[in-house]
Structures are given as structure tokens and as C-alpha cells.
């Protein structure tokens, strides 16, 4: 808590300094935001656990302060103030001008800069459905991308195969597909890892509706829903997984149940198609 307090105070002082350029310049000289030479010094860490995937690490003298919530708050407030990307890059992230994207993407603070750039774009395109993932010529919103990724997890599609399909190998070359698909790939990697490690009590398998349900009862309900064609999106809401981040979903007690439903939904598709065909034929007039 003390670390969080220190970081929040530091954040407030940084934001206040934006309104007075002289103070901002002075602050930039006296307070170092992460030395990019030290491995431990990162604004957004590349290696963290599932619950702390995104945290600020800012050096205050000999101290290192780190907190996920303050990172998000700092970037959001910088965005609200309309802080230019170049100023965030130089003053707050200490990232010098790079000649190539490959050099930039190797900088320890690159992920923070990339996140801020995405936030700016989303603000500019507020109200529009933004592309979260691209497969060939097909574009996916975040919601549709999540559904497709869940299908792959349920089918146990290898991470390496998804890596190839999303063309994220081109990330170092700044290809359009790689930049659009990087977040989708990270999301899939988290979900696939969680799926391979998850364990559930068969007597308290899923929590929804009236409370906990056994695996047997859950399966019976899910089979009925899958037969009826209840959409995956609806079940995500029923399991109270809507609106959660990829990490929050992966760590939620209902995530195994969601994957079970996705698999059943896919398995029952031939049955649904057959029933739909039968209903269509039954409605045709007899000649």
C-alpha cells in the first residue's frame, strides 16, 4: 500500500507538471522514469503473473515502485489531458527516437508506448467498432475475436498454430497483421495456458443462476442450451464473464465451464443444422 501511495503521489505530480512546461522540464531532469539499461526497470513488464500483467515500475531515487492500477490510471489521465505521443515517449518513458520499428520494439518501455498509442486511436474512433483481429480478409471486433479464440481453445489448437495463423511473426517488421493481431495472440496464449492447468471440484463445477452446480448438472444444462443454439455470448453473460479482461476470465472459477460450453456448442452444430433443415422441409407445401 505504501508503494501504491508513493506511486500515486508521483503520478499526480507528473500530471500537474504538464500544465507548466518549465516545471515539467525540471521534473524530467530530477525524477528518472525507469532506466532502460536495467533489466528490472520496466514501465510495463514483459514477464509477470496473470493477475499483474500490466504494472508501472518507476524509480524514485533508490526505490522502485510498482503497481498495476496506477499504471492504468496514469495512462488514462495523460490521455485525458491530450498529451502528445511524442511527449509520452520522451518525457515519461525515456524512449529515444529510433530509426527502425525493430529497435523500438526491443526497448523495455515499448509496451507502454504501444498501449498509449492504442488508447489514443480508440479515443479518436470512439463509437466505432474497431478491428481487434484479422484472419485473411476477415476482420473481427474484440467480441467476435474472443469467440473465435475460445473456439480454438476448446478445440485445443496449439499456440504455435495460432501464432502462425495470426502472422505475429511479422511483429518485428511492423506488418499490419502482426500489430492488429498481437493482443489476440497474447489473449489466446493466456487462455490456452489456463485451460491446460485448470482443475475444478466436480460438485461445485460452475456458479450461475441459483448458485453452484455440479459438473453433471452443468453438462446437462449446457447440452440443452447447445442443442437449442444458445449463443456463446449469452453463456458468457450467464457465467458473469462479460466485461472481464483476458486474465480475469482465465482466473475466474467459471472459465472451465465456459470452455465446456464452447466445445458442446461446436459438437452440437451438426445436430442443430439437421434440425433446422428438417424444420425447413416441414414448412414446405406439398406439391
UniProtKB/Swiss-Prot annotation:
Ranges for region W2 motif: 148-171
Q: Where is this region: W1 motif?
A: 115-138
Principal cellular location given in the protein's record: secreted
Please verify whether the record's keywords include Repeat.
Answer: yes
Q: Where is the protein situated, by its record's location annotation?
A: Secreted; Host cytoplasm; Host nucleus; Host nucleus, Host nucleolus
Q: What induces it?
A: Expression is induced during host plant infection.
Has keyword Signal?
Answer: yes
Going by the UniProt record, its keywords in alphabetical order are: Host cytoplasm, Host cytoskeleton, Host nucleus, Repeat, Secreted, Signal, Virulence
Q: So which domain of life are we looking at?
A: Eukaryota
According to the record, the signal peptide region is 1-24
Residue interval(s) of motif RxLR-dEER = 42-55
What's one GO-annotated cellular component? extracellular region
Region of interest (Y motif), residue spans? 246-267
Q: Which residues form a coiled coil?
A: none
Query: Region (W3 motif): which ranges?
Result: 221-244
**Function comment:** Secreted effector that acts as an elicitor of hypersensitive response (HR) specifically on plants carrying defense protein R4, through its interaction with this protein.
Q: Could you give the domain comment from the record?
A: Oomycete Avh family proteins have a modular structure with an N-terminal signal peptide (SP), an RXLR-dEER domain and a C-terminus with a variable number of modules that consist of W, Y and L motifs after highly conserved residues. The C-ter of Avr4 contains 3 W motifs, 1 Y motif but no L motif. The RXLR-dEER motif functions as a host targeting signal (HTS). The region containing the W2 motif, in combination with either the W1 or W3 motif, triggers a necrotic response in potato plants carrying the resistance gene R4.
What the record says about family reads: Belongs to the RxLR effector family.
What is the name of the protein in this document? RxLR effector protein Avr4
Q: Which organism is it from?
A: Phytophthora infestans (strain T30-4)
